[in-house]
Amino acid sequence: MSNEREILAIGALIHDIGKLVRRAELVDKNQKHTLAGSVFIADVDVDGKKIFAPYQKFVFKHHELDLDDSDPLTWYVCYADNIASSERQTTQDEGFEEKRTLENVLARIGKDEEGKINSYFKPVAAGEIDYATDKNTADRSDFRKLYDALVNDAKKLSLNVENLRFLLYKYLSFVPQSTQKQGIMDISLYDHLKVTAMIALSIYDYVETKGIKIEKYDDLKKLENEKVLLLVEGDVSGIQRFITNVSSKGALRSFRGRSVFIDLFQEIVVDRILQETGFFRTNVHFVGGGHFYLVISNTEQNIEKLKKIQKEINQWLLEKAKDLKLVIESEPMALSEVKDPSEVFQKINEKIRKAKLRMYSVDELNELFDLVNIRSVQNLQTCKICGKRTDKIFSLREDQEPLACDFCKQMYEYGRQVMHAKYFSQDPQGDFEILNERYSFVDEPLKTKNYVLGLRKIDPENSQNLVFIDIVNYAKYQEFEELAEESAGKKLACLQADVDSLGSIFREGLKTKTLSRISTLSRLLTYFFKHEVRKLAEGKNVAVVYSGGDDLFILGGWEDILQFCYEMQVEFRKFTGLNENVSYTASFVMFDEKENIGKVKEMANQAESLGKKCGKNCIVLSHGMKRVFKNHRSILEKSQIVSWKDFTEKTYKIYEKLSKLANSVDRSVIRKALEISLEDSPMNKAFLAYIEARENEQDRDFANLIRTQQIPALNAVLQLIDLKARRRDENG
């Protein structure tokens, strides 16, 4: 990778750093942000060396009027800055307002573009935001705190593109890009800087590869309507079958391990593409849930490299995990389309959809059949998990007979070792293999490439080869039996949730759909399903199987899962500015600790699908895994659908009140209430009135709550209360 590329990327990433300097009021208010950036360059002093000094030209000269002929690299940043800033909606002579906070783009989904919203994010570091507020200004001290932290960390870490990108993500994700008094301010400074670097690098590579002569700045402008960019989409198919294909022994570890593998696999695939095409993580638009988007240069060389990478990766998957298949497609994009790339996204989504219908080529099918035939005639053993023929099988646990091939054994170990690890590092002696490279989970980074698992403090002595990713790896316990031991009635539950109409949100939710704005929107959703979900899970009797992008799947004691359901919805509403146009549908399904995990996931899918069909923005409660069998499939027999509004305001509130009474109410009263919830007859109502006349105060209160309240999903609530009472009776 050429040194010029790294210089260009770093220059693009810091070109607007003066905007933070101005907001921290470290310069005179009349000083332009292009000059204010000199303060940052001077402050990041490492042993007398100002490490950003070689890049100051990008800070001082990224506006057309400031350009000269001495350094063509600044032209690329200037032009990319203009393209990335095409969403700015300003009026003439409106002036500046440095203290405005970042508007919540989630609160604007489906709303009048010109209308006022009342939802903003405080200017704090990533990881410190919990919800949006109605305060649209911040104090100078808020920005100064961010600035000081950024400068302090910049002095510690080795200066390279990925470290700088991460620092800007950490400290500028909730700082607005624009400093205008008027206009929409819902694009973060971080997203603007990243998209500027993305575009600048792509134009540079396009020009260099095609041998285009750029003798003056205006020559770059001539490329406006040319298909300079290439939108790349990747999709890992077969994930659901893959992650549920686990042994009943150690099922939770294997289930989580396979999910962790997908998280790491997608990141390693992205890095493989970036490495072979010569780009950085600045060119990653989105990655999560086995899906990714990149923006690189539209060259024949890159298109051929993508085909080669896809073929090589699928050959590896065919050997190791035949349930999985990687589909990669690309679509050219003009620089003028950055203002609204929605049509380009639609085209590439359709390409992916069609590609997934023809999962294997003739050559791949022949290779698969040859592999099966070779193994069938050899003296091999069969993996009892994936069915692969192999020369050796392993035990997952000491108390278990051998049953797993090397790959399935690794999936189990992923779930075990990820619990407390800080890094996933390339290691020739490592236990894990992905794409013919070996890796280890470690507490300290190695001298090779290290994937940093989440937001954490980095040792400056080991900051050379870091890639920052985020995996929600919380689990109180690693076995179903341990989770069940702390749960009433030893019953477990799962929560599955998925954002409603995500495609429509990106296609139609915003009138102005620039790349920077879409980037901010997708990053905020990912932020919630990573950082906020992690905070809500910590301390609870749960295990996060996966969470990120726009969905999650969590298992645990049913009481903790139910509490998590309530808290997550409350926090999601606050995070999205109470916008009814942004919602998710969830399923809450109870099961026994011995239940097959594949069946649990199937039930969760069916319950969630039911909620999607019945209006979305709801939770589907299913108690006890009651099933009928049809066409060899388990079908949910009884489910109760509750809107999130009813669940948070009524159902869960009544559940809390009844829970407090569960330890003292006669269980016969609870059982009678259960009958009433199924058949509201006059005789049953009379029985409740009789209970209210009893001397036992708790019985009276319980009966009164049931008789006088309109409770959505009452039967589901009462079954949960009956479980708590049953535990009380069993414990004496």
Regions found by a protein language model. Name each.
Residues 197-207, 260-279, 305-317, 484, ...:
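Alpha-helical scaffold within the catalytic cores of cyclic-nucleotide enzymes
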